Structure formats: structure tokens, C-alpha cells
């Protein structure tokens, strides 16, 4: 099969995909995924909150906003360089080949903290790992300096559709987000950008968000697909949980639209059964966050993920064959 990469998908076409009978949608996604990702390799990415809480933004889903009253909304000091690099080393030893670092900032500001960020990026790259940063908006000069430090990717999620956006965030515009992504790309750093389902959006909103991502040329290097984790103390704390198959549909549709992007199964994975997670891998997810914490919310532990991947018959990027993932079953009696 020859994969045709398109950048002209319409919202209507994407909504039609999302509405397909599940087996038909999975078949289409599988056809693309098997061609684009022979061997079913899955990237293991580890995520660390370097600067937690005290964020000036009012994102309705976020526990780190000063506008919300969660346990982590208050300010915490930025971690120092060496402890961050120690965590990166531990992540690599556990099997991760990408280390993502998060700062709860509205925007990057020049000064000692930015210099420390650059040192962290250089340190992670020096270990032979990919380095990703998420830290809000940035300038052209800052994007250029991050590129010089060796940054692999910059994460800046769209979160939701342009139409639903103002119901979720008021302190930063959708255009601000798109301009940030343009600056990153101009500097030669790849994009990591996706969104969240389960925030009261419609199916049309989900299609619209995917349309924005799929219209980018080239497509983002990584597309995180998140399910809302309703955190106490945030405006969305009483939001009804998303249906697991809705996340499967988002993964499958993202795979069809962006054949060569890494579709990363991200926040909300703890709310999925093992079977639903394996279905997401079948639908086209080829990256997961690895480790028991994602910034401030929970994630399956390392051993559970190793067993999950082994049972699914997929392999991590750094492994030569799927059998090396196997975990011995208890001896029968």
C-alpha cells in the first residue's frame, strides 16, 4: 500500500471518519498503521514536571492554574538541573528513549531559569535521548536557542477546537497557540501538539481540532491524544468521564489523517482498561507516556506497561524483538 499524505482534510470528512462503525474505522487505521509502522514499534516517553503550579493561565482542566483551587495550584520552585538529569537517567534505564520536561508557565522568560532549561535539554540529548519541552509561549530568539541546545520537539497543545476553545481558556487565544507553533517550526524544532477529549465538546469539535492539526504542513511530529482527568478544585471537576471507545476513535482517526506522526496515548490512560489500551495500540497509537506520574496526574506504573506491551505483542523502539519485553508468568502449580 502507498500511503497518501494529505493536508486538505475538511472537518466534514473527519467527522465522517469519527462516525464510522468502529470495525470499519479500525480497519482503515490498521491499514495505514501497518504500512507506516512495520513491526508495531512503540516509543516510550517519560514526562517530568520541572516547575509545578502557580501558572497564570486559567485552563479549566488544569490543576496547576492559580485560578483554580486544586492541591497543586500554588507556586513551587523550579527543580535544579542535576536532579532533573538524574530523573532522565532513571527514565532511560527503565526503557524510555524520550524525556519530556514541563514548566507551568504562561510563557518562557529570559534569565536564569531559561538558561537552566537549556542546560537540561543539552544534558538529556547528551544521554542519547530525545528531549521535549512544554513551557507555554516563546519568542523567536528563545525558540532558536532551544534548537541550538538540541531540542527534539516542543509541545504546545491546541487542547480543543477553535469553536470550543473560549469555553475552556480565556487567558490565551487560539491564535497565540498557532503562532507559538509557527515560531517553533521556524526554528527547526519539530512540533508536538494534540488535544483533550471529555471537556464537554461535541463530535464536531473533535473533528475541527483534528482538522487544524492535519492541515499543518508537515504534520506535527507527535500528536498527544488525551482524555480529561477531572481534578478536584478545577472547573471541570464534575465533568462526566469520557467513554473509552471515544478515545480509541480519536487515536484511529488521528492515525488515518497523519500517517507518519507519532500518535501518543497520553493523559487519561489510567481510566482505560488494559483491553481498551491495547485497542488504542491497534488503532494506531505508537507512543505512550511511561512512568507513574504525568505532571500532576496518575499514570500506569512501569511494570504494568511492560506487561501490557508484551501481551499486546508490540515492542519498544529500543528493543530488537518483542520477546525481550516478555515478563515471565508465575509457574503453574
From Swiss-Prot:
InterPro entries: Aldolase_TIM, BATS_dom, Biotin_synth/BioAB, Biotin_synthase, Elp3/MiaA/NifB-like_rSAM, rSAM
Reactions the enzyme catalyzes: (4R,5S)-dethiobiotin + (sulfur carrier)-SH + 2 reduced [2Fe-2S]-[ferredoxin] + 2 S-adenosyl-L-methionine = (sulfur carrier)-H + biotin + 2 5'-deoxyadenosine + 2 L-methionine + 2 oxidized [2Fe-2S]-[ferredoxin]
Family matches, as SMART domains: BATS, Elp3
One GO MF term attached to the UniProt entry: 4 iron, 4 sulfur cluster binding
Domain Radical SAM core: 40-269
Cofactor(s) required for function per UniProt: [4Fe-4S] cluster; [2Fe-2S] cluster
Superkingdom: Bacteria
Record's cofactor remark: Binds 1 [4Fe-4S] cluster. The cluster is coordinated with 3 cysteines and an exchangeable S-adenosyl-L-methionine. Binds 1 [2Fe-2S] cluster. The cluster is coordinated with 3 cysteines and 1 arginine.
Annotated pathway: Cofactor biosynthesis; biotin biosynthesis; biotin from 7,8-diaminononanoate: step 2/2
Documented EC number(s): 2.8.1.6
Function of the molecule: Catalyzes the conversion of dethiobiotin (DTB) to biotin by the insertion of a sulfur atom into dethiobiotin via a radical-based mechanism.
HAMAP family, alphabetized: BioB (MF_01694)
Oligomeric form and interacting partners: Homodimer.
Name of the protein in its database record: Biotin synthase
Amino acid at each position: 500500500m502507498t500511503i497518501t499524505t494529505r493536508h486538505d482534510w475538511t472537518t466534514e470528512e473527519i467527522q465522517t471518519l469519527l462516525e464510522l462503525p468502529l470495525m470499519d474505522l479500525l480497519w482503515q487505521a490498521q491499514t495505514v498503521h501497518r504500512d507506516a509502522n512495520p513491526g508495531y514499534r512503540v516509543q516510550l516517553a517519560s514526562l517530568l514536571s520541572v516547575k509545578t503550579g502557580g501558572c497564570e493561565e486559567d485552563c479549566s482542566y488544569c490543576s496547576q492554574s492559580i485560578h483554580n483551587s486544586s492541591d497543586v495550584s500554588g507556586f513551587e520552585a523550579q527543580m535544579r538541573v542535576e536532579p532533573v538529569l538524574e530523573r532522565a537517567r532513571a527514565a532511560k534505564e527503565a526503557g524510555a528513549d524520550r524525556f519530556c520536561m514541563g514548566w507551568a508557565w504562561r510563557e518562557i522568560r529570559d534569565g536564569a531559569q531559561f538558561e537552566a532549561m537549556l542546560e537540561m535539554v543539552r544534558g538529556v540529548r547528551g544521554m542519547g535521548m530525545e528531549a521535549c519541552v512544554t513551557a507555554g509561549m516563546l519568542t523567536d530568539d528563545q525558540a532558536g536557542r532551544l534548537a541550538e541546545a538540541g531540542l527534539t520537539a516542543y509541545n504546545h497543545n491546541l487542547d480543543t477546537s477553535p469553536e470550543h476553545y473560549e469555553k475552556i481558556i480565556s487567558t490565551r487565544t487560539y491564535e497565540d497557540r498557532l503562532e507559538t507553533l509557527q515560531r517553533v517550526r521556524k526554528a527547526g524544532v519539530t512540533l508536538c501538539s494534540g488535544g483533550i477529549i471529555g471537556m464537554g465538546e461535541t463530535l464536531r469539535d473533535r473533528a475541527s481540532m483534528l482538522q487544524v492539526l492535519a492541515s499543518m504542513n508537515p504534520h506535527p511530529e507527535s500528536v498527544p491524544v488525551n482524555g480529561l482527568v477531572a481534578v478536584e478544585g478545577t472547573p471541570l471537576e464534575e465533568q462526566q468521564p469520557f467513554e473509552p471507545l471515544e478515545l480509541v476513535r480519536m487515536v484511529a482517526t488521528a492515525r488515518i489523517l497523519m500517517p507518519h506522526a507519532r500518535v501518543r496515548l497520553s493523559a487519561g490512560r489510567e481510566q482505560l482498561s488494559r483491553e481498551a489500551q491495547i485497542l488504542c495500540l491497534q488503532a494506531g497509537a505508537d507512543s505512550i507516556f511511561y512512568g507513574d506520574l504525568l505532571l500532576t496526574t496518575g499514570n500506569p506504573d512501569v511494570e504494568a506497561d511492560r506487561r501490557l506491551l508484551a501481551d499486546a505483542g508490540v515492542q519498544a523502539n529500543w528493543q530488537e524483538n518483542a520477546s525481550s519485553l516478555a515478563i515471565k508468568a508465575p509457574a503453574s502449580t
